[in-house]
A protein has these predicted regions:
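Accessory, non-ATPase domains that flank or precede helicase/AAA+ motor cores in DNA-metabolism machines
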Residues: 1-356, 363, 368-384
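Inter-lobe coupling/hinge segments of SF2-like helicase ATPases
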Residues: 195-201, 205, 209, 216-613
């Protein structure tokens, strides 16, 4: 009797579809990919169950075309977690399972990492060959000598030896002095542990000691003020996990936090580290995914989708900035990476640490009801002190493109004292939208009805909701007037005002638009961390987790935008953003100051932030 197999395929299907087992092939197992027919198409799906019961007559079922994997890509626990997630978040099961895979696996490519050419010294090579080559082919002699010393050469090492090194090596291969072979290349970053561990203070030591990899499941909230050394707590726990041969999964909310965390982990850990986020190529993401699955990576740092990466020897999960809304997938298969991380840690029976300076209200409620262990780091590490916070009353104040005279005065004062200034506005673009001064027409997206953001540099209107773009109209579509004006403030508009007011001061703007090119964010952050840019302007990309030791003033340009939003979480998120961005000030020896512009200085939320933190 032919076996019936349930396969989850991408599409609007609440449950897996029934297929007959492939002929002349071993029976595919749950977690394997298969190629199946669906209508006139052929799709990549994933086997969910092999002992399936079906009410459909077998002659009406189609057969699986072929099995794409020799072993399950996803283990039973992770498969069950993704299926549970699809049901919980009311999403088609096939879409959820397939979206959990790297793009190349979704497309049906082999589950193998990239190949790297390795050059090795041939057994026939002799020292006398080297002497002969020095006279006739000095370049080949240099490479042969290198091989005699190190035995092997990788492509990365070869790239540092000059443009003609590969051609010279090929000649050595032709002469029988060297051989080549292909090896798997996972793209791992090696930690060199060049920096000694910091001595933990009492609060850090208590928090770190509570995280026990290899000793069962526990949920711990590491509730530490900005600059309190939460990362040191993570590093202590990760080091102990590595010593036990266990892997650690670290989830971060933003791509921008990955380079800084990776650099710090490399300096402190003697480990193989993989990174997974959307800024990598498809091949790089597949390599990282496979490295974690094969146990080649000791630590995996990733954004929210990394929660679905299989782990060969799981020991610890860390969710940094657990409160952050970026941990929630907002389109396609919608899910909360933090909540799924907690569930996955429970299924794997490993501890999970949730870190934040501004925990979400639901996490605080769980901690106070003792569902989570609550560990507080209430003081900044080292000699750093909490910044002085003040409100700048905007009522009746003349402004220059949203910048009040008191804020401009504080910026100038800190620049004169050789300080670094960070100005925060959580709205990219030149202005939120365009308005007609004659009739009040507003630029709305014709696809989704959201307001279209005005980008002056590109001379375009861009919908940040559905990604639609269009040219700026020459006249009002409603009344024909040519008096179209930008309405409200965006980072591009503030940048223009700052360049006019502080023309001789190096300025860096960091938002999603200015960091689209690969590596641009890292370059801009390095300039900021070295103090080369004295004025920093940015959105929430700058507010989270970055160590900027020379920032002495943080200015919040528009606190009011979060006070009266329709979202019931708007006040909570405003408080979190202000506290997070305020934490960038005064992180080293010099004291910090935070200036918050508002038309509502008496608002209870702002008063609580200023006086109660």
């Amino acid at each position: 009797m032919t076996q019936t197999i349930q396969v989850a395929v991408p599409g609007p299907f609440a449950e897996p579809l029934d297929y007959l087992a492939p002929t002349n092939e071993p029976l595919p197992q749950p977690g394997m990919r298969v190629q199946v027919p669906l209508g006139r198409r052929q799709l990549v799906g994933m086997v969910v169950e092999t002992q399936a019961q079906t009410h459909i007559e077998s002659h009406r079922l189609k057969s699986i075309i072929t099995t794409l994997d020799s072993e399950p890509l996803i283990d039973a626990d992770l498969l069950a977690l993704i299926i549970w997630s699809a049901h919980y978040y009311h999403h088609p099961i096939g879409e959820a399972l397939i979206s959990a895979l790297p793009a190349r696996l979704r497309q049906g490519h082999a589950a193998t990492p990239s190949a790297e050419t390795l050059w090795q010294l041939s057994a026939h090579a002799q020292a006398s060959d080297l002497d002969a080559l020095r006279r006739r082919a000095p370049r080949q002699a240099m490479l042969l000598e290198h091989l005699m010393q190190s035995q092997t050469l990788t492509a990365a090492q070869l790239a540092g030896l000059g443009g003609d090194a590969r051609a010279a090596l090929q000649k050595l291969v032709a002469k029988g002095f060297a051989t080549t072979q292909q090896q798997h290349h996972y793209g791992l970053m090696a930690g060199h542990a060049s920096e000694p561990a910091f001595a933990l203070n009492d609060a850090q030591h208590t928090s770190a000691a509570a995280i026990q990899p290899g000793h069962g499941h526990a949920i711990l909230l590491i509730d530490g003020v900005t600059g309190s050394g939460k990362t040191e707590v993570y590093l202590d726990a990760i080091t102990r996990a590595i010593q036990q041969g266990l892997q650690t999964l670290v989830i971060v909310p933003e791509i921008g936090l990955t380079p800084q965390l990776l650099s710090r982990f490399q300096r402190r850990l003697a480990a193989q580290i993989a990174v997974l986020h959307s800024g990598l190529s498809d091949s790089e993401r597949l390599n990282a995914w496979l490295a974690a699955r094969a146990g080649k990576a000791d630590v995996l740092i990733g954004t929210r989708s990394a929660i679905f990466v299989p782990l060969a020897r799981p020991g610890l999960i860390i969710v940094d900035e657990e409160h952050d809304a970026s941990l929630k997938q907002q389109d396609g298969f919608r899910y909360s990476a933090r909540d799924l991380a907690i569930l996955r840690a429970h299924r794997l029976e490993v501890p999970i640490a949730l870190g934040s300076a501004t925990p979400s209200l639901e996490t605080l409620a769980n901690a106070r009801s003792q569902r989570y262990q609550h560990h507080q780091l209430s003081e900044r590490a080292g000699q750093a002190q909490a910044p002085l916070m003040r409100l700048l009353d905007m009522r009746g104040q003349p402004t220059h493109e949203g910048l009040s005279a008191p804020l401009i005065e504080r910026v100038q004062s800190h620049l004169d004292a050789d300080g670094q200034v960070l100005l925060f506005l959580n709205r990219r673009g030149f202005s939120p939208t365009l308005i007609c001064h004659e009739c009040g027409w507003l630029a709305e997206c014709q696809r989704c009805d959201a307001r279209m953001t005005y980008h002056r540099g590109k001379r375009r209107l861009h919908c940040h909701h559905c990604d639609r773009e269009q040219p700026i109209p020459r006249d009002c579509p409603s009344c024909g007037s040519v008096d179209l004006r930008p309405l409200g403030l965006g980072t591009e508009r503030i940048e223009q005002a700052l360049q006019s007011r502080f023309a001789d001061t190096p300025l860096v703007r960091i938002d999603r638009d200015s960091t689209r090119q690969r590596g641009s964010f890292e370059r801009q952050m390095q300039a900021a961390q070295r103090g080369e840019a004295k004025l920093l302007l940015g959105t929430q990309m700058l507010a989270k987790g970055h160590h900027l030791p020379t920032v002495t003033l943080v200015g919040v340009i528009d606190a009011d935008q979060g006070l009266f939003g329709a979202d019931f979480r708007a006040p909570e998120r405003l408080a979190q953003l202000i506290i997070q961005v305020a934490g960038r000030a005064g992180r080293a020896e010099r004291p910090g100051e935070v200036a918050i512009q508002t038309h509502h200085p008496e608002h209870p939320l702002l008063q609580m932030l200023i006086h109660g933190g």
